[in-house]
Amino acid sequence: MMAKRIIPCLDVKAGRVVKGVQFEGLVDAGDPVEAAKRYDEEGADELTFLDITATHEDRGIMEDVVRRTAEQVFIPLTVGGGIRTNDDIRRMLVAGADKCSINSAAVKRPEFVREAAEQFGSQCVVVAIDAKCVEHDKHGRPIRWEIFTHGGRQPTGIDALEWAHRMESFGSGEILLTSMDKDGTKSGYALEMTRAISDAVTIPVIASGGVGEPKHLLEGLRQGGADAVLAASIFHFREYTIPQVKRYLRDNHIAVRL
């Protein structure tokens, strides 16, 4: 059985780790390089840096953060935010990233994903999907989700399931799936959406948005069918450590690397 991955996510703004609720009201949570080092030492499987302002602000600082992190951290590093061209990807890979996460630029020009996969390999390409529920069935269960871009501010009218399918066919190596309804709420992942997209594609799906306790990670893997789970504030503010979370998952019969 493939071990499930635990991935701390570092939302970075102007070179600092921040964590907000639904992308607003940001609170400074520290230095990204120090945080990354701590997670590496604790046994995180991977790290994700999201430059949450790069899509509509400056981005040069991020390269420096990636370079300094890669010098000290030896687990796979994914970088997203403001990745718009193959040159952006190349620069991040040269700085020390292992994968690049593409979001708004893929929506704007889906061919970019195909071009990136052809040039760098699917293993370097992650498509980030930020989605909100837009339709419920008569029992109130979520049944349809739409893609939003620009930090959740811009609706696109694109169906999330169809988009995930299309991005897989274009060569994406994995999907980073964030529920904009759940992000920062600490109420757990959007399990119906996670399960629907995990079932719709054959590439790995990383669940994101809404973790408040280890039980939510377990639900994302078990009910959501995710291959990996991503969380931010529960780790940044030391509510739980990576070893605590991994022991909890192992005790609940989830295969993890200890």
UniProtKB/Swiss-Prot annotation:
GO terms for molecular function: imidazoleglycerol-phosphate synthase activity; lyase activity. The active site is at D11, D130. The keyword Phosphoprotein does not apply. Pathway: Amino-acid biosynthesis; L-histidine biosynthesis; L-histidine from 5-phospho-alpha-D-ribose 1-diphosphate: step 5/9. One of its GO terms (biological process) is L-histidine biosynthetic process. It catalyses: 5-[(5-phospho-1-deoxy-D-ribulos-1-ylimino)methylamino]-1-(5-phospho-beta-D-ribosyl)imidazole-4-carboxamide + L-glutamine = D-erythro-1-(imidazol-4-yl)glycerol 3-phosphate + 5-amino-1-(5-phospho-beta-D-ribosyl)imidazole-4-carboxamide + L-glutamate + H(+). It is found in: Cytoplasm. Keywords: Amino-acid biosynthesis, Cytoplasm, Histidine biosynthesis, Lyase. One of its GO terms (cellular component) is cytoplasm. The keyword Ribosomal protein does not apply. It holds the Pfam family His_biosynth. Its EC number is 4.3.2.10. SUPFAM superfamilies: Ribulose-phoshate binding barrel. IGPS catalyzes the conversion of PRFAR and glutamine to IGP, AICAR and glutamate. The HisF subunit catalyzes the cyclization activity that produces IGP and AICAR from PRFAR using the ammonia provided by the HisH subunit. NCBIfam families: hisF. Belongs to the HisA/HisF family. Heterodimer of HisH and HisF. This is Imidazole glycerol phosphate synthase subunit HisF. The gene is hisF.
